């Protein structure tokens, strides 16, 4: 049985609402995060450990962080990958956040080196502890629900 790691890591995972929305994640609670076909994103997913926390980012129209999930199952083969190259992880809903929009993140020089700003097309990326803390504070300051 795998146990949670001592050092928690933080991640951001993007989804297009037409494919998988935050509302669907909340309703389902735990779901596999499949369909990732980028080698860098897959490399990050292989580093994820049970208990790591993830920001759910809704891309395309909203472009906003919507909530927090945790890794509940580590990397394993993705059943949607016919070539059997890529894998997936399971994520579990933790809580909603007041939205933090990409425009707010880009406007803050603190995030100049944040992968969401520098590598905009990457769908899975690490978040440093300081970035995580700042994003959570930004959410707490926002008045949107």
Region spans (language model):
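Short, charged, solvent-exposed linker or helix-capping segments at domain edges/interfaces
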Residues: 24, 100-105, 136-138
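Short acidic/glycine-rich loop or secondary-structure boundary segments that cap or lie
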Residues: 20-23, 63-66, 79
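Charged phosphate-binding loop/patch that engages nucleotide di/tri-phosphates or the phosphate backbone
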Residues: 127-145
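Short, acidic Gly/Pro/Ser/Thr-rich loop/turn segments
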Residues: 18-20, 98, 134
């Amino acid at each position: 049985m795998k146990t949670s790691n001592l050092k928690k890591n933080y991640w951001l995972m993007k989804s297009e609402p037409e494919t998988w929305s935050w509302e669907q994640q909340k309703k389902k609670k735990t779901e596999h995060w499949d369909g990732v076909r980028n080698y860098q994103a897959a490399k990050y997913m292989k580093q994820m450990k049970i208990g790591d926390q993830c920001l759910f980012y809704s891309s395309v129209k909203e472009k906003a962080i919507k909530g927090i999930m945790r890794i509940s199952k580590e990397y394993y083969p993705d059943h949607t990958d016919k070539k059997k190259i890529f894998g997936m992880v399971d994520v579990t809903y933790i809580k909603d956040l007041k939205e933090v929009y990409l425009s707010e993140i880009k406007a803050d020089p603190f995030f100049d080196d944040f992968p969401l700003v520098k590598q905009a097309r990457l769908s899975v990326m690490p978040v440093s502890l300081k970035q995580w803390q700042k994003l959570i504070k930004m959410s707490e300051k926002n008045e949107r629900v």
